[in-house]
Each structure stands twice: as structure tokens, then as C-alpha cells.
Amino acid sequence: TMRDAKLQLLPLQEDMPFAVASMISPSGMTLAGKHGTGVLSIGSMSEAGLAALPTQWSFAEDAAKEHGNIVNRKDWRIVMFWHIAETREQARIEARDGLFRWRNEYTAGTLMQQGVEPFTSPDQGVDEMAFVDGATSVIGTPDDLIARIRDMIKLTGGFGTVIGFVHDWASRENTSRSWDLVARYVLPEVNGMLDAYRESRQFVVENRETFDRAREAIMDKIMSNEKAAEALKQASTAP
């Protein structure tokens, strides 16, 4: 039991957030609502779990209301599988052999998960995991992962955090590159960090005449001053 359990390593932060694991049944969400904690949805990595996601949050809300608590979607974490590369074909090449062994030797062979059958080939594994309706993984480009995360937001009605499941489908180098691509291109996009840049660019495009007039006014001011005009001339002819 957990009666005499102790942590061997204490957390670095004094106030540590708690999250209840949730799969397909209402149990995890109900427990989170009862105690007002966050949720870690690991069922999102299976087809049945994905199908259950749209109704999952209501279990937490109902339990929270019953016990006088409040739950916030920002505390809902969704776990996802992915391997990202510059192209879909490259991601496929990098992940297929490791995915094949992971499924056949670990998930089906060691864990013997109910309903999980071994793949017959590496390519079949990639197709079934990432390129069918209800696929549980993203094996592709940063844009593919961005699109899938946005689909998950629509499917669930909104959540707070995406957590990538660390696996060993690809080599250490390619796995590191995958996470680098996620950090560089996926995180800024899904967190809205690029919105201001795009708005600024669009403003410049739509107000080009205003900027041109300002530039002309500056040039007129320079040319009306003999010393300034000479300095500009020298600067423009300098090697």
C-alpha cells in the first residue's frame, strides 16, 4: 500500500501541481473533479481514448460541482505520440523500424495490451499509427503536428497543455532533431507567439503608401540641408 510510502527525491518547487491520469473510463476525471486537481489524459494515445475525449471533461466538471470544487481546462494535459522531420517521407524513414519493434516487442510482446496486434511490416505500422482515420500519432512535419494539435483542441473543446510521449522509434540524433523542430516551429505557432509579427507585417503591406510618404519627407529634409545632402552622397558612393 501507499501507507508508508516516501519520496526518495523531493520536488524542487514548494507547491507541486498534481494531476490524475485519465484513460477511457470516467474514473480519472471524476477523481480530478473531486479533489480539484489537474488531469493527464493518456487515453489520447489510443483510438478508443480519442473517441472518448469529447465527453471526458464533463465527468470532471460534474464531480467538481458535487464536491464544491472548480476545475479549469488549463489544467488538462493531453499526451500525444509524434516524430517530426523536415518532410513526411523523412519522418517515415526515421521512425518506421523503431516503431515496428516498439509495437511488436514492447506493446504487444511485453505489455500484451488487450486488442493490440503486432504489425506485419514497418510500413504498415507507420500507416496505421499516423495515416488512417482516428490515427493516434503524428509522423510528419511541424505543420502536420500543428494541424493535429488544433484538431485535438476542437475535439476536446479546449485544454491547457500538450505533452509529447518520449519513445525510441528513431535514433538519438533524429529524435533530438524532432524535438528541436517542435520547439522551433510548433510551440510558437500553437501558442500564438507569431500573431503579433504577422499583424505587423500585414500592417506594413497595407500601409505601404504611408511609409513611402514618410521616407520621401525624410529625403526632402536631408536634401534641403547642404551638409546632410553631402554626407548622404558620400555614404552612397563609399566602397
Predicted regions, residues:
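Glycine-rich, proline-tolerant flexible connector loops at the mouths of alpha/beta enzymes
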Residues: 44-50, 163-175
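Extended catalytic-interface subdomain
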Residues: 1-12, 17-24, 30-31
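Active-site-proximal loop/turn and secondary-structure-junction residues that shape catalytic pockets
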Residues: 24, 45-46, 82-84, 168
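C-terminal structured "cap/appendage" subdomains that terminate the fold
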Residues: 176-185
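A conserved active-site cap/scaffold subdomain adjacent to cofactor or substrate pockets
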Residues: 27-57, 75
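An alpha-helical appendage that flanks or caps ligand/catalytic pockets
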Residues: 1-8, 48-160, 187, 191-239
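Hydrophobic faces of well-ordered beta-strands that scaffold small-molecule active sites
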Residues: 18-22, 37-42, 74-81, 162-164
